[in-house]
Amino acid sequence: MKRTRSAVLAWTPVLALSLAACSGGDSGGSTGADGGFEPRGDVTMVVPFGAGGGSDLAGRATGTMIEAANEDLTVSVENREGGSGAVGYSYFLGESGNENLLLATETALLALPISGEVEFDYTDFTPIMKLADDFTLMIVNADSPYQTCADVVEAAKSERITAGISGITGLDNIVFTLTEQETGAEFDRVPFESGGELTAALLGGQIDIASLNPGEIIGQLESGDVRALCAFSEERYDYEALADIPTAAEQGIDVSFAQFRGVLAPGGISEEARQYWIDTMEAAVETEEYQTYIEDNYLQPNTASGDEFVEYLEGNNELLQQVIGE
């Protein structure tokens, strides 16, 4: 599958959460035999969300592909959930200069600062690589009366529809907000800290609909426990398991949005360490482990490394500011 660059537009509401960061500690790096940077000991991949969701899957898969690209590295994953990602990102902010630390990043990197209630933005960190784009599906229980996304939208104009979201600044909330703006419907949000919790709530009948990435819900789709009403993507998926799911646009809802998946290093690291991690991730996306991650999670392999990733973030941040800057 060919990898390309892409840019997406996001929107998010205000998050009333402010977390102060502490000062960073030991860099964790060392000088190699050739005078360049090398990590010292194990590397930690921070996931700013709970276990079981798309961000957790991304962080663990990224660790695996890094290890495949460099057999001298061992990557452990550490979940720091809370505040729709704010807890993990704020912890990461406090680790400025730590060259043995990475973070599995996504849309919250841009969405949280737009809220104006956190003490960081993307410029406080070191962008390493954008790995992929991840579209989302509107999901209902198998016994739901709704057959299409258009059915849900029409119902939401006159009755209460509870919509489960994973974090109040993430992809799920964005697509529901864009759908509201496009159609005039209103959804009653119920936030959860991870895709795993969101799936459990949907299966338990606590919510009417959910927005979930294919990789988070494919097992339940294949078992028939849930149904996908539409995909918030520009075109239908090429993947056989998802090819029959119509886009929202096909149902008269002109909304598409892709959450990016990527890797950050802390701010304040050396240029040698930055280049080391860029080189490592460029090697990582050439591994079979990367291809497996893309295919198993039904992602679009659109990559951007180093300065290209910075440009991607700059462009999307400008678009976000235009939408919700006032």
Where are the language model's segments positioned?
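Short, low-complexity disordered leader/linker segments with a strong preference
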Residues: M1-D42, E326
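Hinge/capping helix and adjacent helix->loop/strand transition within the periplasmic-binding protein
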Residues: G94-N100, I114-E193, E197, A248, ...
